[in-house]
């Protein structure tokens, strides 16, 4: 899904691409609502990927909120695309690489060092195509923010951090 969203914004341009992404999000929300309320075999299989006691599709909802925030507040296309990489690709890489690893971060025992490195590396390499050398410090900052455990979902905190950094830089 992340590649589709990033490609849509890149190929169609910021404004039209954003409209299409909002359409994707609306369709995804409707599908998620149906699957959450349904008891068919597909929804049962999908519910296995959610944690016990968590609303079905909550992670996707937070991802949608973060995506809409990025596209709503960052109007510089290269940075917006980089932030979409952070939300859709780097966060997934951190989870895949870091899950079940024994070496944990000293400040957050729920996150692993390999997950942190996976997030940073995937962002720095992929975002380099859009923002060049700035992908390295931004990747380090976003990996740190993603690895800190706070009360909000990391899809929202990453989006907010990117928006704040963009607003600060645009004033300089």
Model-derived features: positions:
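Charge-lined substrate channels and their catalytic hotspots, especially those that engage the 3′ end
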Residues: 27
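Interhelical loop and helix-boundary elements at the membrane-water interface
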Residues: 1-20, 30-129, 133-172
């Amino acid at each position: 899904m992340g590649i589709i969203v990033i490609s849509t914004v890149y190929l169609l341009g910021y404004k039209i691409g954003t409209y299409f992404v909002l359409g994707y999000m609306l369709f995804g929300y409707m599908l998620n609502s149906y699957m959450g309320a349904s008891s068919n075999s597909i929804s049962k299989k999908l519910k296995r990927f959610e944690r016990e006691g968590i609303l079905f599709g909550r992670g996707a909802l937070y991802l949608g909120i973060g995506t809409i925030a990025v596209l709503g507040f960052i109007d510089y296309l290269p940075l917006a695309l980089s932030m979409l990489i952070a939300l859709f690709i780097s966060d997934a890489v951190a989870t895949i690489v870091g899950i079940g690893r024994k070496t944990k971060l000293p400040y957050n025992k729920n996150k692993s060092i390999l997950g942190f490195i996976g997030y940073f590396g995937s962002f720095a390499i992929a975002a380099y195509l859009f923002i060049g050398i700035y992908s390295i410090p931004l990747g380090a900052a976003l990996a740190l923010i993603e690895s800190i455990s706070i009360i909000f979902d990391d899809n929202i905190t990453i989006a907010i951090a990117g928006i704040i950094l963009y607003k600060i830089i645009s004033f300089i």
